[in-house]
Structure formats: C-alpha cells, structure tokens
Amino acid sequence: MAEIVTCSNCGKRNRLPAAARGMARCAACHIALPWLTSASDGDFEEVVTASSLPVLLDLWAPWCGPCRVVAPGVERAARTLAGRLKAVKVNVDEAPRVAERYGVQGIPTLLILRHGREVARQVGAVPPPALLRWVKEMISKPAA
C-alpha cells in the first residue's frame, strides 16, 4: 500500500510506501515529506515496528466522535514534524490484534512508539495545538 503525497516545496507528487524505512523525501527536491499512513493487523509489523523514525500511532474508529476531533491534530503533527515522525492510523474495528497488543481500553488512544515499543500514551481527545506540543516533547526525549 502506498500514499500519494504532494511536496509543499516543489509540487511534485510522491508515492510513499507505507512500509518503507527511513525518512520520506521528495523525489525531486529531496525535502522531508509528511508521512501519514495507515496499518492493519496484517501489515502492522512492516509499517510500524520496522520504522527507524518515532511513530505516532492513532488508534481510532469511524463511529467515534472524539476520534474525528483528534484526526486533524495527527495530520498537523505529521506535516509539522516531517522527517522526524511517521504518523500511522489504525482502525481498531478492522485491526483488533493491534488494539489488543497495546491494551487499548478506550479510543482515541495515541501512542508514541520507537521500534514498536510504547514510550508514551495519550487517551482521549486532545486539541491539535496540545497534541502537537505533546508529540514534540515525546519525540525529543532520548530513546531509553
């Protein structure tokens, strides 16, 4: 699975495979691109655990009102922290094993992961500015 991301610098449309490693860069001008993708039970390991970047994992469901409040903040974090973060959305209705793996009791649940290991958790709706501050703080901490 791949996402098409338009470079904000040069306008080039770039194909970003969900499971790629490293940093997403524009094929034309080489600046860092925002990396927002999705994962399922079947591809979670490749998309998330293998990532060399910290991952903002958004565990959500389409029927969840607070999840819709959080979604713009996740997208904003991916754009603002391009090259420093990979944002991955997981629909818990379609990926129950991922939700079980991280012991998700309520949604939205936001996790910061490094190599698949949880380093921070936020449960419940968070306004976009507060979410961005939280993510910046969590990814700036040295890996344990």
What are these regions (language model features)?
Residues 14, 32-33, 71:
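Cys/His-rich microdomains that often coordinate metals
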Residues 16-24:
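Short linker/helix segments within small regulatory modules
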Residues 37-55:
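A short beta-strand-turn-helix
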Residues 38-39, 59, 70-97:
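Thiol-based oxidoreductase modules, predominantly thioredoxin-like and allied folds used
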Residues 27-37:
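Short Cys/His-rich micro-motifs in 6-15 aa windows
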Residues 52, 59-63, 106:
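Short pre-active-site segment immediately N-terminal to redox-active cysteine/selenocysteine motifs
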Residues 7-10, 26-29:
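Short cysteine-rich clusters marking metal-coordination/redox-active sites
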Residues 106-107, 111-144:
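Non-catalytic, surface beta->alpha helical segment in thiol-disulfide oxidoreductase systems
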